[in-house]
């Protein structure tokens, strides 16, 4: 299961989405992670707790012309870009 770490929130600023550390996390993670609407779509699933497979399925459903290999690659890259804000639970 992939989920957002406690203390990370998403805020929309103009046309961009920012993942921001709050509370104690703000003391150790002083950056802002910028993403787009697709990233926000994934983030909302991650906030609730999801699996990699569910992210892939949701992406392919949302973007009908997206093939599985590309979805897997894109989601892997997205998860790497937001790695400070997520955790994997077995």
Summary of predicted features, one role per range:
Residues 1-44, 89-90:
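Acidic, low-complexity/disordered tracts enriched in E/D and polar residues
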């Amino acid at each position: 299961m992939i989920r957002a770490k406690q203390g990370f929130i998403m805020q929309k600023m103009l046309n961009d989405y920012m993942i921001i550390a709050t509370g104690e996390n703000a003391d150790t993670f002083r950056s802002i992670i910028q993403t787009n609407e697709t990233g926000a779509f994934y983030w909302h699933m991650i906030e609730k707790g999801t699996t990699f497979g569910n992210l892939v399925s949701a992406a392919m459903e949302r973007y009908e012309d997206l093939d599985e290999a590309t979805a897997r690659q894109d989601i892997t890259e997205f998860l790497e870009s937001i790695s400070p804000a997520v955790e994997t639970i077995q």
